[in-house]
Amino acid sequence: DAHYLSHDAQVVADYRADPQCHDRISARLARFIADAGPATVATAPTWAVPTLLMWAGADRLVNPAGSRAFAQAAPPAVVQSHCFEGAFHELFNETPEYATPVLQMLQDWLLARFGVKY
């Protein structure tokens, strides 16, 4: 249900009005997602790419358990992770209550690792 994209009603309305958005995926994509999730979590202990992993705690469009499992298995020196409790699926398109801390965390992470300001 598109209602769970964001707490921002305009984001939901824009999504529903977009003719390119639909509720179907191909069988090939579904298979890839089903296979890649567990495979990615299995590689988490050897993950070497600096990563900021953020997920929505109230996501009803995808199960956040995969993000949580990856975060718990990955080296904390390489993967910084955070669950934004109460936020819906589109973290960057949420209401300011949710989006502001998301964007602040991204900015802080980029500055700390790459000297880049978002």
What residues fall within each predicted segment?
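Alpha/beta-hydrolase-fold enzymes
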Residues: 1-28
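Short beta-strand/loop motif that positions the catalytic acidic residue
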Residues: 47, 53-55, 59
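Short alpha-helix in the alpha/beta-hydrolase fold that links the catalytic acid
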Residues: 49, 63-73
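Active-site nucleophile elbow and catalytic-triad environment of alpha/beta-hydrolase enzymes
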Residues: 25-43
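Conserved strand-to-helix beginnings and helix N-cap segments that scaffold or border functional pockets
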Residues: 27, 63-67, 95-96, 103
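Catalytic active-site module of serine/aspartate enzymes centered on a nucleophile-bearing elbow/loop
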Residues: 78-118
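Acidic catalytic loop of the alpha/beta-hydrolase fold
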Residues: 22-23, 58-62
